[in-house]
Amino acid sequence: MLYPKEFDVIVVGGGHAGTEAALAAARMGCQTLLLTHNIETLGQMSCNPSIGGIGKGHLVKEVDAMGGAMAAATDEAGIQFRILNSSKGPAVRATRAQADRVLYRKAIRTRLENQPNLMLFQQAVDDLLVEGDRVVGAVTQVGIAFRARAVVLTAGTFLDGKIHVGLDNYTGGRAGDPASVSLSARLKELKLPQGRLKTGTPPRIDGRTIDFSVMEEQPGDLDPVPVFSFLGRPEQHPQQLPCWISHTNSRTHDIIRGGLDRSPMYTGVIEGVGPRYCPSIEDKIHRFASKDSHQIFLEPEGLTTNEFYPNGISTSLPFDVQLELVHSIRGLENAHILRPGYAIEYDYFDPRALKASLESKAISGLFFAGQINGTTGYEEAAAQGLLAGINAGCYVRERDAWTPRRDQAYLGVLVDDLITRGVTEPYRMFTSRAEFRLSLREDNADMRLTEVGRELGVVDDVRWDAFNRKRDAVSRETERLKSTWVNPTILPAEDAVPLLGKPIEREYSLADLLRRPEVVYNDLMALQGGRHAPEVPLDGDPLLMDQIREQIEIGVKYHGYIARQAAEVDKLEANESTRLPEGLDYTEVRGLGFEVSQKLNQHRPETLGQASRISGVTPAAISLLLVHLKKKGLGRTRSGNSQEAA
């Protein structure tokens, strides 16, 4: 049957990508339908019970800066919070939280059910409605046809998914859920390029059977307690729990080696490539044969369960081998396994067939986000979902797509890497992937993206008000620090030495003093009984005050480095944003070799910058392209969220 109501946007899948996509499109005012095979698993954390980490936490902050749900849900569900790399520079500091699975799922579902313009429907999708080269809807497994102007696919690991435990395997999207076989077949029928990847998960353990007394306790950060959302507060956090650390040993490794003849990875049963940066324990033993042990983190799954997630022993070995290897680990000698570990193999679709908006180049109105694009991780999925949802909304409203630049957001780095380089293994975000990471910090994600989000219609009044107060206070106080001067008379030696280590010998601005490595903002403001503090408090909200102080301090201390990086961005920007005509035949560009023109015709980059990052495209080829564009008068430039003729 044809459903009587037509929608603007349909989102297929209710994981981390799908929920952010649906919420974003609905916040933009689009009539949105989220189709999921099971409403009870909306926002399900399919693998580890944690959010964030190096590079990943940056993505979560960016999603939050644009009104997304992941950070706020984590603040409500997080049972341990830590700042990683806290002793290092601000560019690589990252927030990570353990989350209660049940509370996280509840937080996401609450937001979905209360979001205006968004409807939920429980049915798996088997088919897409395509007319010509345009998607017009989706069909569920019982034949209900829903029509829409745009469709966002966020199918995760469900597309033709196959679960492996030892040499046994069966179809499934994850443990306990069916695979999406018909939809995968339909996408292949549409001639969309695809491949096969795999990921895995460890056995889960009953905490009542773990001997924590022989393990190292790992508590969360307490002073201060971190929050994920720019609007989050520590008092939102539920009860906090520690994690625990143990290690594999030589006996563990011998057990694993003895089981490799029944490993689906090492017997050729699994064809898909697994994630390099989250390898299975059998892969670790093989790749790092000289290591005597590997660290294992015992992570609590929640406040109302005894289940623990042993991070570090993801495996698809037969269950009898899993049992033996778990029992060989200190503290787990008597452990009871609640669920066996497994690997899952699934279809992904080549992201090089997508525009920077995550819209298919072949089928108008069809967007892809999450693991279907070859990524791994909740955070990477959520960020893509946000972008796909926004651009589906822009497509429906006939507005230009928003495509963040590499110097603007980790989301820009992520998407640019995917659409220019593709994937040969599941893609994970790291800070090292960003050329301009000093400017792409967790702490300034809102400064980079909230204004853009407001223009796009995804940032509400509460967030916008808090952002403006923060931005104005940072600007006002930074200027005051630059224009307030002290000299040896105003700041005598007896006051200067405790803070600076020596007297000042000439006149300095307060910004000059703050730039010194040993000086922090609060101490500078407390100097001489608060004589140099602002007359009016920066903000009445203590949480916002902390963010404002952090922004001021980083901005002043790293001003020179940030300014140099901004100059580098300006130099690159002209070529980076020069648009390439959609119909350009690269074989007609004089001087381009056959291989280069073939690759460019195959991948159809949207900008000169994207073309430069395609494997095999040389700087000389980019110069030839630039000459060709100028000669033909074809070059156009692209801004951060609009496209216009130069």
Curated annotation (Swiss-Prot):
Single biological process term from Gene Ontology: tRNA wobble uridine modification
GO MF assignments: flavin adenine dinucleotide binding
Main localization (coarse): cytoplasm
Complex and partners: Homodimer. Heterotetramer of two MnmE and two MnmG subunits.
Entry cofactors: FAD
Protein localization: Cytoplasm
Keyword NADP: no
Reported function: NAD-binding protein involved in the addition of a carboxymethylaminomethyl (cmnm) group at the wobble position (U34) of certain tRNAs, forming tRNA-cmnm(5)s(2)U34.
Protein name: tRNA uridine 5-carboxymethylaminomethyl modification enzyme MnmG
Entries under Gene3D superfamilies matching the protein: FAD/NAD(P)-binding domain, GidA associated domain, C-terminal subdomain, tRNA uridine 5-carboxymethylaminomethyl modification enzyme MnmG/GidA
Amino-acid positions noted as binding FAD in the UniProt annotation, renumbered to this chain: G13, G14, G15, H16, A17, G18, V125, S180, Q371
Cross-referenced PANTHER family: GLUCOSE INHIBITED DIVISION PROTEIN A, PROTEIN MTO1 HOMOLOG, MITOCHONDRIAL
Gene: mnmG
Family per record: Belongs to the MnmG family.
InterPro entries: FAD/NAD-bd_sf, GIDA_C_N, MnmG, MnmG-rel, MnmG-rel_CS, MnmG_C, MnmG_C_subdom, MnmG_C_subdom_sf
Disulfide bonds: none
Binding positions for NAD(+) per the UniProt entry: 274-288
GO cellular component: cytosol
Sorted UniProt keywords: Cytoplasm, FAD, Flavoprotein, NAD, tRNA processing
